[in-house]
């Protein structure tokens, strides 16, 4: 092993850390830097006693001051031939991380790194020379920087469930690596009620300028000045000091449709939040105070990434109850209307994609069921009707027939033209018919 160590010093000039991590799986309770220095000290004492000046020069070149001290003309220390001096700068890298994270609120973090092939090749050749299988530089660097950041910020590293991931990328440059901070998003779930018509669910970019701003949109970049997403998101974004947000909901209602009752499930994803511990009851109250005439939220609670998929799935399996204000082309006898509505219950509707959404939906026939159809108010040529429908059934076209694209329709069955003047979603139910 002594000859192997001399050969390793000659070929690779390893720093204490790189030499130590070659034996990183031997003994516990020692840092690799301590292991490497201990090996060099042993070699130095042996070489000094036996008068091996060449070995002492190799050790001095690798940074062992004790070896340099006994030489008349010691060589200057040179950078490590394996890590190229990177592992001597872990304190500096830890300071960079601490400076970047000091204003962020988080419970745990993890340090990661990416390395060029030349470094991995050099360490492998060092291990082959020594006849050992050592600890990779990636693991050493990540651990040592992490330990120092823990001390600097008084926080703990948490590789399994970190709020923050810090990544150094040494592939472009060992001297000036790229540095990335990935902050785990915050997920807030709940339900929203839209109390005023004319508000889209999500931000609607101007179709002429595609969000850039033009006279058509009064240079806002938006077709509508506000949306459910923005009204809720602006309060949550400020509360968590987030850079931006994404809105995920269980389906959507038309702009001119209100969302009432128990509300529509949603998840707000807050990106790069500087705060993580916020009282959601207080935020719920703040949202309802600020925008409650238009939009309200209920049941806000912390969620997780899986909730995004769940809320999307919910839109595919959840029935909705609607209240529709219907205008007929001429008065329809009440008994006939009640008979038609009774016949609609449990009916399967064949509905070709409505003309009004053909620009954004595939033109195909969907088969959906009407589970309930009840007359609430009647006044000759007007009526208020409640429908309980499968997800994805277009209620406006169920009423009008959409020029024969929806069959059967209310208009077809009463043999009078019919249109939906107003529409509300009044209940959001799960796939079993219970409230979600």
UniProtKB/Swiss-Prot annotation:
Pfam families: Pus10_C, Pus10_THUMP_arc
Record has Repeat as a keyword: no
Ligand binding (substrate): 322, 394
Species classification: Archaea, Methanobacteriati, Methanobacteriota, Methanomada group, Methanopyri
Family: Belongs to the pseudouridine synthase Pus10 family.
Biological function: Responsible for synthesis of pseudouridine from uracil-54 and uracil-55 in the psi GC loop of transfer RNAs.
GO molecular function: tRNA binding; tRNA pseudouridine(55) synthase activity
Active-site feature positions: 254
InterPro entries per the UniProt record, alphabetical: PsdUridine_synth_cat_dom_sf, Pus10, Pus10-like, Pus10-like_C, Pus10_THUMP_arc
Enzyme class: isomerase
Keywords recorded for this protein, A-Z: Isomerase, RNA-binding, tRNA processing
Cited SUPFAM superfamilies: Pseudouridine synthase
EC number: 5.4.99.25
Record protein name field: tRNA pseudouridine synthase Pus10
Catalytic reaction equation(s): uridine(54) in tRNA = pseudouridine(54) in tRNA; uridine(55) in tRNA = pseudouridine(55) in tRNA
Gene Ontology biological process terms in this record: tRNA pseudouridine synthesis
